[in-house]
């Protein structure tokens, strides 16, 4: 059995980006480890969700542990950096934020966290962090540096994977969602889709820093058998994701269409014309 480490930026990223893969690997008997760079202090909490004097970072720490339990994660660890906020947020300049961290120093922290693990695969984001988030980009840099150092030290077996979004598949899902919205409106039904969320995603899809085209993606992991656990893990993040959110309100069949496959890249093995692999551990 393998040890697969998922390195994420904030609590909830693990559930949204890779929760299905984590649950599937755990069910198959592999050791799944989650490392989180920050505690998500700069997130925007759902109104009224925090208790008196409850710090958002503390709440999100508890939420990621709950999510990890649902997904079958064997261990959760934090690097100890502060959330950097979104692009151009003033929090980007905070001296303790992950974005400001020296990459070598952060790599040493990651190495300390993983010193007791025999890592077979490390999962980070693609080179632009999925959608350009500073902390996601930094995860890519630090995780890549860690793997490079391991290889230089003689570990030829450790593998790197990028979790990403399939730009083409997401466009198809959005087109289908819009068709369903129009149908529901035409017959007077209440549509589950969130117009604002769809518009945000459409704007992001127009950017070259959002996900990757299907032709560059080497792994498409079918997670339909564990989608219930993925959705429960998402639901654990109550400070960030309300019950009426896009992620939780959609019918099961729509959720399966949108999230039934999770996408990865093996940066050492360009896809070319090869079919996508359904096994994250295979080169």
Predicted regions and their residues:
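Active-site rim/loop-helix segments in enzyme catalytic domains that contact anionic ligands
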Residues: 1-118, 144-153, 265, 273
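Metal-dependent de-N-acetylase/amidase catalytic core
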Residues: 1-3, 92, 100-283
């Amino acid at each position: 059995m393998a040890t697969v480490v998922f390195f994420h930026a904030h609590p909830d990223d693990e559930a949204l980006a890779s929760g299905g893969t984590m649950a599937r690997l755990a069910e198959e008997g592999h050791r799944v480890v989650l490392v989180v760079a920050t505690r998500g202090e700069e997130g925007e909490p759902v109104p009224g969700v925090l208790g008196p004097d409850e710090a958002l970072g503390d709440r999100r720490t508890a939420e990621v542990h709950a999510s990890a339990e649902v997904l079958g994660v064997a261990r959760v660890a934090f690097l100890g950096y502060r959330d950097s906020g979104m692009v151009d947020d003033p929090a980007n300049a905070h001296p303790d934020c992950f974005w400001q961290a020296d990459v070598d120093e952060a790599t040493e922290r990651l190495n300390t966290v993983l010193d007791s693990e025999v890592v077979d695969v490390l999962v980070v984001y693609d080179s632009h962090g999925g959608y350009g988030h500073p902390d996601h980009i930094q995860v890519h840099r630090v995780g890549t540096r860690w793997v490079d150092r391991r290889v230089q030290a003689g570990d030829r077996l450790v593998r790197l994977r990028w979790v990403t979004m399939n730009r083409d598949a997401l466009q198809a899902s959005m087109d289908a969602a819009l068709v369903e919205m129009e149908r529901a409106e035409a017959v007077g039904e209440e549509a589950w889709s969130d117009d604002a969320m769809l518009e945000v995603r459409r704007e992001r899809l127009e950017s070259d820093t959002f996900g990757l085209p299907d032709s560059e993606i080497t792994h498409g992991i079918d997670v339909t058998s564990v989608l219930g656990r993925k959705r429960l893990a998402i639901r654990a993040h109550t400070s960030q994701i309300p019950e009426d959110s896009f992620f939780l309100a959609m019918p099961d069949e729509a959720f399966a269409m949108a999230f039934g496959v999770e996408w990865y890249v093996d940066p050492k093995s360009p896809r070319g014309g090869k079919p996508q692999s359904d096994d994250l551990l295979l080169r």
